[in-house]
Amino acid sequence: MARYTGPTCKLARREGADLFLKSGIRSLDSKCKVTQLPGMHGASARRQKGTEYGLQLREKQKIRRIYGILEKQFRLYYKKASQKKGSTGENLLSLLECRLDNVVYRMGFASTRAEARQLVSHKSIMVNGLVVNIPSYQVSVNDKISIREKAKKQSRIQLALELSGQSTQPQWLDVDNKTLKGVFKNVPSRDELPSDIQEHLIVELYSK
């Protein structure tokens, strides 16, 4: 299955939630009506109350799209999360948050996770002084993330830094915007992550 490259607004409207797929402080512009279903009759169509299974499936799709994960890879993350001690749902979120592309995005070096994925794939990111071009690379506590010297002047990185400077930096990261370096201080706890994610629905879905 190929990675989705169509309109990001359509995905947000399908899930009825902001998936943070667009750059900027507000990830959706005024043209993207999140509560309106996509399609010709989206404006007049009503979002039906789904079944229990439908709600679980939608939540899984929402989280997959937020982090840009394909179905097969998402299942592998869930399997790994279920094998670890503690809450499977929280373990799953931790694994997703520790992805290198997500950390690059959280540090403000990219405006979106998709953009962060490109930076990693194009060998613009270093971990502990070594180039890493695998977006799914799992970042560990105290790992040092930096932008390669030749990539520092990219306009998209400068724009991302400008935008990130207007928002609150996650407490589990220590970022120096002048040197374009950051430290992954600790794995974020559940209360430090978005509250609108209902990971328990995914656990219920895969537990059947």
UniProtKB/Swiss-Prot annotation:
PANTHER family: 30S 40S RIBOSOMAL PROTEIN, SMALL RIBOSOMAL SUBUNIT PROTEIN US4M. One of its GO terms (biological process) is ribosomal small subunit biogenesis. CDD domains: S4. Coiled coil: none annotated. One of the primary rRNA binding proteins, it binds directly to 16S rRNA where it nucleates assembly of the body of the 30S subunit. HAMAP family: Ribosomal_uS4_B. SUPFAM superfamilies: Alpha-L RNA-binding motif (SSF55174). Residues 98-160 form the S4 RNA-binding domain. NCBIfam families: PRK05327.1 (NF003717), rpsD_bact (TIGR01017). The keyword Ribosomal protein applies. Pfam families: Ribosomal_S4, S4. This is Small ribosomal subunit protein uS4. It comes from Vesicomyosocius okutanii subsp. Calyptogena okutanii (strain HA). Belongs to the universal ribosomal protein uS4 family. GO terms for molecular function: rRNA binding; structural constituent of ribosome. Gene3D superfamilies: Ribosomal Protein S4 Delta 41, Chain A, domain 1 (1.10.1050.10), RNA-binding S4 domain (3.10.290.10). The lineage of its organism: Bacteria, Pseudomonadati, Pseudomonadota, Gammaproteobacteria, Candidatus Pseudothioglobaceae.
